[in-house]
């Protein structure tokens, strides 16, 4: 490619053309300004000129005998004065309109420039915000944990910046302790239910009790109140006679295999708890049997003084 070279003469001629164009524009604007100022001056002096012309025609009309010529000259002067005034007013209004348009164009241009600058500032702000977000997103470390380990109620941003702590993991011994506690709580309840079932009399026993009440007073005297030893033996028999329901041996082995290992200390604690529960149950059975015997003796015995068994039972009580 050939380099384009410009001579000094061409550069100087270009500058001269630019200067001539600028000077011509300045001269035209100056001429228009002068014309506008002259027209404004003429409008200002038009009132005084019209008043002086009216006085002159009035005096000339009175003194001159040729009134027709005076009237024609007056008409011509008034027409010329009106035309000149209209011309001046039109020129002034045109110049004023041009000035207003120029100023309005300048105002619109400035508004457009201001709006363009505001738009550029807005775009720059958006780009800065986007760049900051991209940098922050690069700094944020996403959590590497599974969703189920995220704690509920925590903020998403905090969980994204700081890794969520793992939930506490319990050992096998802790889980076995919990299982053993649940079993120890469930066993006394089941035994109490069996004790209550053994304690509640069957319908056949109730029938025998009603028959004994219907017997004669002599037989009632021979009948003795049941002792606590018999009740305890009966409860033992009912416990021993309660068969375990037949179950599948494979299912039993599966449940045994699933059970966690238990510490021997837990066996000791459970045995002590069972022993204390059993002693409390015996005491409750004794007190209940004594109360029942006393109530039966009160209901079945009519003669209090001649009843030796009642006095002996009261002595025992």
From Swiss-Prot:
Signal peptide: none annotated. The keyword Cytoplasm applies. Residues 162-296 are annotated as: Disordered. Residues 196-206 have a biased composition (Low complexity). It comes from the Eukaryota. Residues 278-288 have a biased composition (Basic and acidic residues). It is found in: Cytoplasm, Cytoskeleton. Residues 171-181, 207-223 have a biased composition (Basic residues). InterPro entries: ABI. Residues 182-195, 226-235 have a biased composition (Polar residues). Keywords: Cytoplasm, Cytoskeleton. One of its GO terms (cellular component) is cytoplasm. The keyword ATP-binding does not apply. Its main location: cytoplasm. Binds SCAR. Belongs to the ABI family. Involved in regulation of actin and microtubule organization. Part of a WAVE complex that activates the Arp2/3 complex. This is Probable protein ABIL3. It comes from Oryza sativa subsp. japonica. The lineage of its organism: Eukaryota, Viridiplantae, Streptophyta, Embryophyta, Tracheophyta.
């Amino acid at each position: 490619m050939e380099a384009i070279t410009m001579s000094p003469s061409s550069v100087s001629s270009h500058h001269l053309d630019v200067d001539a164009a600028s000077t011509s524009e300045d001269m035209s604007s100056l001429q228009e300004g002068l014309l506008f100022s002259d027209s404004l001056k003429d409008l200002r002096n038009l009132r005084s000129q019209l008043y002086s012309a009216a006085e002159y025609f009035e005096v000339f009309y009175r003194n001159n005998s040729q009134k027709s010529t005076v009237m024609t000259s007056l008409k011509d002067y008034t027409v010329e004065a009106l035309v000149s005034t209209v011309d001046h007013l039109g020129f002034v209004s045109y110049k004023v309109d041009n000035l207003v348009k120029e100023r309005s164009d300048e105002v619109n241009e400035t508004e457009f420039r201001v709006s363009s600058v505001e738009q550029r500032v807005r775009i720059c702000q958006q780009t800065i915000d986007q760049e900051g977000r991209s940098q922050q997103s690069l700094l944020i470390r996403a959590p590497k944990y599974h969703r189920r380990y995220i704690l509920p109620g925590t903020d998403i941003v905090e969980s994204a910046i700081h890794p969520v702590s793992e939930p506490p993991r319990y050992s096998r011994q802790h889980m076995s302790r919990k299982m053993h506690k649940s079993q120890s709580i469930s066993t006394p309840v089941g035994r109490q239910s069996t004790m209550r079932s053994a304690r509640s009399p069957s319908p056949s026993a109730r029938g025998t009790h009603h028959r004994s009440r219907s017997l004669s007073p002599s037989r009632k005297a021979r009948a003795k109140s049941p002792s606590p030893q018999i009740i305890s033996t009966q409860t033992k028999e009912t416990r021993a006679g309660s068969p375990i329901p037949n179950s599948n041996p494979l299912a039993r082995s599966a449940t045994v295999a699933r059970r966690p290992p238990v510490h021997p200390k837990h066996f000791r604690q459970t045995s002590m708890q069972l022993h204390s529960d059993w002693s409390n149950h015996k005491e409750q059975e004794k007190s209940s049997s004594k109360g029942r015997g006393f109530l039966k003796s009160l209901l079945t015995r009519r003669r209090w003084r001649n009843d030796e068994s009642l006095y002996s039972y009261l002595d025992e009580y």
